[in-house]
Amino acid sequence: MLPWTLLDTAQIPGGADKLRLMCRGSEFSIMLDDIELMNSRVGGSEAALARLSCGRISARGGARILIGGLGMGFTLRAALALLGEKAQLVVAELVPQVVAWARGPLAGVFGASLADPRVSIEETDVGRLIRSARSTYGAILLDVDNGPEGLTRAENDQLYDLRGLSSARAALRPGGVLAVWSSSPDRNFTQRLSRAGLSVEEFRVRANGSRGARHVVWIATRPE
């Protein structure tokens, strides 16, 4: 078996932690310490995040979508496949080097998705875009950290607490969808979504299609 090779590191803004981009043959991994955050061969649940949310609004021709976290682009590519040519997709990525990796060593993984005219990349905290928006987005897709309880960056808690969820609700258009990915279930988070005035469904999805660990996707809808 081929050994893993370190390609690059990236400082997480506002903290001491560093991401590591690793390569083994044609396989890529982004690591935080000894935790694998994402792998180029395992993206089924991230794609499901887009499928379960964008599938509900795909009939709305000019939908504006906000994706929190670029990762390896599984969610972005799945959303592009579902949405029409008039859709607009804004991807917020906190770590500039992750965007550079997507255009560099991970270009083969991303394909043509970053060059799609529907896509714009914002190198910023997705929470800032959410808090500044009012009835703007048809869907907000969050794949930040490992979910509400898998925090690798303390500031991310502001996305998942009641105040953050209320901000997300305000940023959605009536009938819009907040979709949240998590590596594990969280009953308290489900209850917080409801308290924020959202109608909630919870789905268990496989990490890689029909195989792998079971992850969670919440679909929370703002009433019309």
Predicted regions and their residues:
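Short N-terminal helix-initiation segments at or just after the protein's N-terminus
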Residues: A10-P13, L32, D161-A168
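Short, basic/glycine-rich phosphate-binding loops at helix/coil junctions
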Residues: S26-D33, D143-P148
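Glycine-centered, phosphate/nucleic-acid-interacting loop/turn motifs that mediate DNA/RNA or nucleotide
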Residues: G176
